[in-house]
Amino acid sequence: MAFQECVIEVAQDQAEAWSDALFDLCALSVSVEDADADTPDEQPLFGEPGLEPTKLAWNRSRVVALFGDDTDPALAVAAASNALGIDPVPAYALREVEDQDWVRLTQSQFEPIRIGERIWVVPSWHDAPEPDAVVLELDPGLAFGTGSHPTTRLCMQWLEQNLKAGETVLDYGCGSGILAIVAKKLGAGDTLGIDIDPNAVEASRYNAERNQVQADFALPESVSEATYDLVVANILSNPLKLMAAMLSARVRAGGRLILSGVLERQAEEVAAAYAPWLPLTVWRSEEGWVCLHGTRP
């Protein structure tokens, strides 16, 4: 069976309506993407699980609908446009998608990733490329963080080069738990991962068990306000600015703070938000993203 993928670029306030209309017209699946993804104009969206997001789509959104061979995408787009009162019908692109072993295809897209000098992130269906490597077995799943994004790589490289054996670590916004797990594998002492999403906490616990490391993971309201030698937060610039006082307070005197999820153009304003508590500078940048670090006096 062959499928057809239809791609339409729409305005931010039309993305949800187009998605609903195409679903009503027999689309098998519909997704909305940032039309500026992987460019300097990429626009991160964030929100808390269980709450309505502040924005439902990107300024320039790309609606991608998949149709079976029993549906004409051109007719569906025309009908959706008519139902939405949009004239003329917007331009769209079609691409044929052949049916295949989707599990095998998905697995083939996730190869082992080398990060820094010694760290490898390896899906469970692959063997470790180097016997003496620091290996994290991690599959794509519910929570963010498989080592493929520049911000995750930057934080892992920082830990590889700067973590001292026995240092206590707080991973705030732990996602998949990848940073807490690699910290333990690099010799960290007591390590805690915190996330506001219960699914992320469960995913982190599962990944830690698979990797045979002892680390704790919890929701923020269930842990004490202890201080740590290292606090790492790979989130996004706006939440990082809002949490400046709280995250700074979790760093012990003489301890270090590592932040990522920050674009190069956002680095100065994030550093300014933390300036009352500790100085932050750019440690390294990659693909337009930066890792900030600093020591608390």
From Swiss-Prot:
GO terms for molecular function: protein-lysine N-methyltransferase activity. Its EC number is 2.1.1.-. One of its GO terms (cellular component) is cytosol. It is found in: Cytoplasm. Gene3D superfamilies: Vaccinia Virus protein VP39. S-adenosyl-L-methionine binds at T152, G173, D195, N234. It is an enzyme of class 2 (transferase). It holds the Pfam family PrmA. GO terms for biological process: methylation. Its main location: cytoplasm. It catalyses: L-lysyl-[protein] + 3 S-adenosyl-L-methionine = N(6),N(6),N(6)-trimethyl-L-lysyl-[protein] + 3 S-adenosyl-L-homocysteine + 3 H(+). Belongs to the methyltransferase superfamily. PrmA family. NCBIfam families: prmA. Methylates ribosomal protein L11. This is Ribosomal protein L11 methyltransferase. It comes from Cupriavidus pinatubonensis (strain JMP 134 / LMG 1197) (Cupriavidus necator (strain JMP 134)).
